[in-house]
Structure formats: structure tokens, C-alpha cells
Regions:
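Amphipathic alpha-helical segments
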Residues: 190-211
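A short, amphipathic edge element
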Residues: 181-183, 211-214
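Beta-strand/loop substructures that line and gate deep hydrophobic ligand-binding cavities in soluble
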Residues: 257-307
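Long, compositionally biased intrinsically disordered regions
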Residues: 228-237, 241, 266-270, 275, ...
Length: 324
């Protein structure tokens, strides 16, 4: 994931976590939850220490009630606000919760210089402002993490620690669809393979990760229709669920308009690999080069396609966080 993409998706995730818990400001603990919700190396490292997104959310709730009890306030269960559902979060998109002074200072001083999730996690627990009473350290300690060991571990991770972004390759694996190029990318997500399989195969939730909501035309029993506006013409794409098993979900996307009517534009093949505390999602994008000009230009434009893969995986991580 590029530095800009990491920073923006992290900001979005931390705001969503604060909103989900109905908190009035984004605090450092929401920044940690954001890293878990974002997926990637930091989430995988934390999962190896037993800290999943679900466990960290529960720990924030436990610590909040413990702090209230410490000053003599005890809320009955009936008065405790329920977390906001995924549907509510989607409906309320656009509203922004302000950063607390502590979070704003961290972002202003360090935010844009943290180009990977591991660097962001290291900064959260290694900042000169961190003490044994800091919210992030308290949260991790509450989850049973040896924070000193975690600091040492993170210091040994290289700056460019996210999974390598591979170059495209030729393939005949998807020749039955008429596709001749493949790109792949992998990302750790703090969710179970079963949860992700249910999410990824559901046509009603394609807009959570695959199709921009404003481009959705229709939802079908086995897929959806997408409208893509171009500078000269509008194209329609038919998404179809090809494979849906516990460890693999495959979607094909066929052009259903214009002179390319009936041609498969791409296949998104998602492999779910169980990992400690979550799932490694491997996204394989098989696609075509669209004629001689496409073949000539492809060595120049394929990096933009690769960026699309990274955005898709980030969208899946976000959707899983909202769905849990």
C-alpha cells in the first residue's frame, strides 16, 4: 500500500472506530483500533500477540467502564450505548468526529511521515509522550501484550515491511475467460475466514468492497450490474459469482453493452488463508489488454491496475471491520 493510501485509510478507519463506539472524539485507542481495522502488517503483528480487532474493541469497552467505576459511576447494561451497526455507519458516512488534542498532536507531528502500518504502531507505543498510563499501552497491557517485547519486535521490521507488490505476469490459467494478464496482492485482515467468505460471496454487499455505491444499477441473485461512466460512453458490467467455497470466492465481470458486449473484462479470485488472529486474503486479478493498443500501453499503465488491487483489499478490510 502506498504511503498516502495507508495514511488516508488509517484516518478513515480510526474515525469509523470512534463512531462505532459512539465516542465524541478520536482518541489514541481509536488510532490503534484503526490499524487493526485497516489490516496489513501491524494488524498481523498484533494478532500474533493475541490482539484481534474484536478483542481490542472489547478491551476499550472494559477499560471505559472500569474508569467510570473508579470514580463511582456504574452504568447498568440497559443504559450502555450499543455499538453502531455497519448499516448505520454507511448511512452516516460523511460526518466526521473531531480528533482529541492528543490524537491531533500525534497526527500533526508524525502522521504523514509514517509510511507503513508497522511504523504507525511503533510510533503509537514508542512516542516520547507514551507512559505506562497511556491509553494505547494500557489497552495492549489489558490484552496481555508484553509491550516492551512488542517495541523490540517492531524496531526490527524494515520500513518497507508491507507485502511486496509484484509485477504483472502472463497467464493461461484464466484463458477460458479470454484473459491474459494477472496481478496479485495479499493482505492480512483481522477477521475469520468464515466471516470473510460470507461477506465476499454476498451480492448485496458488493458495494462494501467491489462496486462504488453510486455505480450500482441492480443486484441479482448471483451478482450485480455496474454502470461505469467514461468520457465518451457509458459501459455496463455484469458481475457474476463463479466460485463460493470456504477458502475461495471468485467473481467474473462481463461487459454487457457496446462493441465489447459479452467479453469478460476481468476476474477477481479471492483466496482465504487462515492465519493467527485472522486471515490472509490473496487477491488475484486476471484481466485483458483490449487489443493491440492495450498491449502496447500495458507496460506503462499496469501500475495503476495494481493500485486498484490495493484499494480493493483495503475495502475488504474496512467492510469486515464494519461487519463485525
Amino acid at each position: 500500500m502506498t504511503a498516502v493510501a495507508h495514511y488516508l485509510t488509517w484516518l478513515e478507519a480510526m474515525h469509523a472506530e470512534a463512531a462505532r463506539l459512539r465516542h465524541q472524539e478520536v482518541e489514541p485507542e481509536h488510532m490503534l483500533l484503526g490499524l487493526l481495522a485497516q489490516g496489513g502488517t501491524a494488524a498481523a503483528v498484533l494478532a500474533a500477540h493475541g490482539v484481534t480487532l474484536a478483542r481490542a474493541r472489547a478491551a476499550v469497552d472494559d477499560m471505559t467502564h472500569a474508569d467510570l467505576a473508579r470514580v463511582g459511576i456504574s452504568l447498568p447494561d440497559a443504559l450502555r450505548p450499543e455499538p453502531i451497526s455497519a448499516e448505520e455507519l454507511t448511512a452516516k458516512a460523511g460526518g466526521e468526529i473531531p480528533l482529541s488534542d492528543t490524537a491531533a498532536e500525534f497526527i500533526d507531528n508524525k502522521g504523514t511521515s509514517l509510511i507503513t502500518s508497522a511504523q504507525a504502531l511503533q510510533a503509537l507505543i514508542s512516542s516520547s509522550a507514551v507512559s505506562l498510563q497511556s491509553p494505547v499501552v494500557r489497552l495492549l497491557a489489558h490484552c496481555g501484550v508484553d509491550v516492551e517485547y512488542l517495541r523490540t519486535e517492531l524496531s526490527e521490521i524494515a520500513a518497507d515491511e508491507e507485502p511486496a507488490r509484484g509485477r504483472y505476469r502472463m497467464t493461461d490459467e484464466y484463458c477460458g475467460y479470454g484473459l491474459d494478464r494477472v496481478l496479485s496482492q495479499e493482505r492480512f485482515i483481522s477477521a475469520s475466514a468464515a466471516q470473510l467468505a460470507a461477506l465476499l460471496k454476498d451480492p448485496d454487499r458488493l458495494t462494501w468492497w467491489g462496486i462504488p455505491r453510486q455505480q450500482l444499477v441492480d443486484v441479482l441473485p448471483d451478482g450485480a450490474v455496474q454502470r461505469v461512466e467514461g468520457r465518451r460512453r457509458t459501459a455496463f458490467l455484469r458481475w457474476r459469482l463463479e466460485t463460493a467455497v470456504d477458502t475461495r470466492t471468485t467473481w467474473s465481470c462481463t461487459v454487457v453493452s457496446g462493441r465489447r458486449d459479452g467479453e469478460v473484462a476481468f476476474v477477481k479470485d479471492l483466496h482465504l488463508i487462515e492465519a493467527p488472529g485472522g486471515t490472509r486474503v490473496r487477491l488475484v486479478l486476471a484481466h485483458r489488454t483490449w487489443g493491440r493498443l492495450g498491449t502496447l500501453l500495458y507496460p506503462i499503465v499496469w501500475r495503476g491496475t495494481r493500485l486498484g488491487l490495493e484499494n480493493t483489499l483495503a475495502g475488504i478490510a474496512r467492510a469486515a471491520a464494519e461487519d463485525s
